């Protein structure tokens, strides 16, 4: 029997397959049709839609275990990429993935989850004890702060469970994600994964990364003044007079907004779970959110008066707002771009759009892995306890290829973020017409 003749497709021809119902990707030079798979893709539809029509080997390697490769054959179109090539950066990146796998750095680290759960149990017990068995206002305030710390730590577990297997059993891993996010925090793990996977794929794309799309309250670039389109939310991000007013003073309102940011996450979670959007384990997630909506208000109701109840809730939200600040520090002051994420410069875009936070090892528990955000973006399935180990390898690779490896102290990162917000705020004040008088009496009397 004669050998089968290979069929080829060029990169330009591949680009034409980037529309709903016609989604092709290339992995190691082989073209795959994922049009029908998009609705069942565990990582959601957005990554496939965003990278369709491109060579995406590096992104595939970053997000999928080795066991996934055997599933690709059923999507193979029979076409090979005629002009397929691998950059030196990608070659070295893939070598690192292979070496780290050989070193066992991707292996499950259940002890980290267990230690975090023990810490969460302690925080929960202390907060509940302070509410139920103590009478002082300051104790109740402290109990609210402890609840905020609990939400931060449960967020790290949800983050870990959403990225990789924190335990050996897949069903238990899903339960851990729902328990940490939905039951303890009231946040849908399904919504978080949908949002967070998009952020990883389109790191710092103003049109595709939802973690930069906070109009009307915050913008990190004057490019938003042109009313860009969010391909994540599938709507126009209109920069109107109200947006301009808020943005003009965003460097003053940044921290208060971060303290209240969790309220938006509650709303987004409910929208996700109560609409027709495809959600795995919808019933389990709704049950988890119901559990939270019972125990937290019940605990708050045990406080002696409405003043202390409001104080407790504000303290909880404000403390967990530190986590929202941490998310922002990693990207707000970094390089941004307009347009689709590219599959052929995966390593470069992840390093260019990300900032590490330098901290001593004994503070790793506080940052939950975000202090090594560059490493996390490049190797998202790696347990966070190993990110410090691989940092020297990443630094060396960045130096070899003259790529940025940006890092700053926690205080410096805050300063950089506020500077970015202030620069954009000042630009917003200057464009075209003055701010509407009925919105900005205070603005007319405020400077800086």
Swiss-Prot record:
Localization in the cell: Endoplasmic reticulum membrane
UniProt entry tagged with the keyword Heme: yes
Gene Ontology CC entries for this record: endoplasmic reticulum membrane
Pfam families, per database record: Cyt-b5, FA_desaturase
Residue interval(s) of motif Histidine box-1: 159-163
Keywords: Endoplasmic reticulum, Fatty acid biosynthesis, Fatty acid metabolism, Heme, Iron, Lipid biosynthesis, Lipid metabolism, Membrane, Metal-binding, Oxidoreductase, Transmembrane, Transmembrane helix
Its job: Fatty acid desaturase able to introduce a delta(6)-double bond into delta(9)-unsaturated fatty-acid substrates. Can use both linoleic acid (18:2(9Z,12Z)) and alpha-linolenic acid (18:3(9Z,12Z,15Z)) as substrates.
Homology family: Belongs to the fatty acid desaturase type 1 family.
Protein's UniProt name: Acyl-lipid (9-3)-desaturase
Taxonomic placement: Eukaryota, Viridiplantae, Streptophyta, Embryophyta, Tracheophyta
């Amino acid at each position: 029997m004669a050998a089968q003749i290979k069929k080829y497709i060029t990169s330009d021809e591949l680009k034409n397959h980037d529309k709903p119902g016609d989604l092709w990707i290339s992995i190691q030079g082989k073209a795959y049709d994922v049009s029908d798979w998009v609705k069942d893709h565990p990582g959601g539809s957005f990554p496939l839609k965003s990278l369709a029509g491109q060579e995406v080997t590096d992104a595939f390697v970053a997000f999928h275990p080795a066991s996934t490769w055997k599933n690709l054959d059923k999507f193979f179109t029979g076409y090979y990429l005629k002009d397929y090539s691998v950059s030196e950066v990608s070659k070295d990146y893939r070598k690192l993935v292979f070496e780290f796998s050989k070193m066992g750095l991707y292996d499950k680290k259940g002890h980290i989850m267990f230690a975090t759960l023990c810490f969460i149990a302690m925080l929960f017990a202390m907060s509940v004890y302070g509410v139920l068995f103590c009478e002082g206002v300051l104790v109740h305030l402290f109990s609210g702060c402890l609840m905020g710390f609990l939400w931060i730590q449960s967020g790290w577990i949800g983050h870990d469970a959403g990225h990789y297997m924190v335990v050996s059993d897949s069903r238990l891993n899903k339960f851990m994600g729902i328990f940490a996010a939905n039951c303890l925090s009231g946040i849908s793990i399904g919504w978080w994964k949908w949002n967070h996977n998009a952020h990883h794929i389109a790191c710092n794309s103003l049109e595709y990364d939802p973690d930069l799309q906070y109009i009307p309250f915050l913008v990190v670039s004057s490019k938003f003044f042109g009313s860009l389109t969010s391909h994540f939310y599938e709507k126009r991000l209109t920069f109107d007079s109200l947006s301009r007013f808020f943005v003009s003073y965003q460097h003053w309102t940044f921290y208060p907004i971060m303290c209240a940011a969790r309220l938006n996450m509650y709303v987004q979670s409910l929208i996700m779970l109560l609409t027709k959007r495809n959600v795995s384990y919808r019933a389990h997630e709704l049950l988890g959110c119901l559990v939270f909506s019972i125990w937290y208000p019940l605990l708050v109701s045990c406080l002696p008066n409405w003043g202390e109840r409001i104080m407790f809730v504000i303290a909880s939200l404000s403390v967990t707002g530190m986590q929202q600040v941490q998310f922002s520090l990693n990207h707000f002051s970094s390089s941004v771009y307009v347009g689709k994420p590219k599959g052929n410069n995966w390593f470069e875009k992840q390093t260019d759009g990300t900032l590490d936070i330098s901290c001593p090892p004994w503070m790793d528990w506080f940052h939950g892995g975000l202090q090594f955000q560059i490493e996390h973006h490049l190797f998202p399935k790696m347990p966070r306890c190993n990110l410090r180990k691989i940092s020297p390898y990443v630094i060396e690779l960045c130096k070899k290829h003259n790529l940025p490896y940006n890092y700053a102290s926690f205080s410096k990162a805050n300063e950089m973020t506020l500077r970015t917000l202030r620069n954009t705020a000042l630009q917003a004040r200057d464009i075209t017409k003055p701010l509407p008088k009925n919105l900005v009496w205070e603005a007319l009397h405020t400077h800086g």
